[in-house]
Amino acid sequence: MANLTYSERAQKTKSPLVKKLFTIIEEKKTNLCASVDVRSTSQFLDLIEKLGPYICVVKTHIDILDDFSYEKTIVPLLELKKKFNFLIFEDRKFADIGNTVKLQYSAGIYKISSWADISNAHGVPGQGIVAGLKQAAQETTQEPRGLLMLAELSSKGSIATGEYTEKTIDIARSDKEFVVGFIAQRKIEAKDDDEDWVVMTPGVGLDDKGDALGQQYRTVSEVVTGAGSDIIIVGRGLIGAGRDPVAEGLRYRKAGWDAYLARLS
């Protein structure tokens, strides 16, 4: 469905979460997800305040925050979500058996299922990981929740390729109600008419090509126009040292939207 508009896909999908996501993308004219990896809550919230108008999703690693508290971190985060109309994606990368991930998702100090619209998981444990996370979501909230499976990664030497990727896609197909898409480097082809996977792609940069820790960057046009991804995930390109988050937010939003329009044409 790479040649359908986000609006057309919003109308077609059976998933309330995906419908909400594509509607936000269309209304705000942005397919940009901001990855906000900082260690203080004040900086975290300040960056989201600045980037909010330009993004459809904010991606968190909530356990990075040194001063996390539900009241001082999550409550204001949810207020920003309402103010700027974006979804929250906690990049937790669950990777354990069903019962364990159920608790990791819903309990502890973070209570992820209570506030994160989207989370993600590795396929290593098998289908039980999907069942455990879905059960936790159903037991803790009435709000729509969705899971992305990690089909491919952007880091050098990743083993999430070939047969592993295909088996992860098979796991996703075991529950197409809760699993809404993938972290991947390219569009995941639909097997039948009821499939329309959301693909979010990390490792996107307009300036840098990589880092010393194995990250590899591709351009926005390579990812969206060429590979058919739906949402670009950008972190250091927006909030890295010396960067102006507002200027970069505008820049990446325009680049992402232009690449999407080029794909449609």
UniProtKB/Swiss-Prot annotation:
One of its GO terms (molecular function) is orotate phosphoribosyltransferase activity. Substrate binds at residues 37, 59-61, 91-100, 217, 236. It comes from the Eukaryota. Pathway: Pyrimidine metabolism; UMP biosynthesis via de novo pathway; UMP from orotate: step 2/2. It holds the Pfam family OMPdecase. One of its GO terms (biological process) is 'de novo' pyrimidine nucleobase biosynthetic process. The active site is at residue 93. It catalyses: orotidine 5'-phosphate + H(+) = UMP + CO2. Its EC number is 4.1.1.23. It is an enzyme of class 4 (lyase). InterPro entries: Aldolase_TIM, OMPdecase, OMPdecase_AS, OMPdeCOase_dom, RibuloseP-bd_barrel. Keywords: Decarboxylase, Lyase, Pyrimidine biosynthesis. The keyword Lyase applies. Gene3D superfamilies: Aldolase class I (3.20.20.70). Belongs to the OMP decarboxylase family. This is Orotidine 5'-phosphate decarboxylase. It comes from Saccharomycopsis fibuligera (Yeast). The gene is URA3.
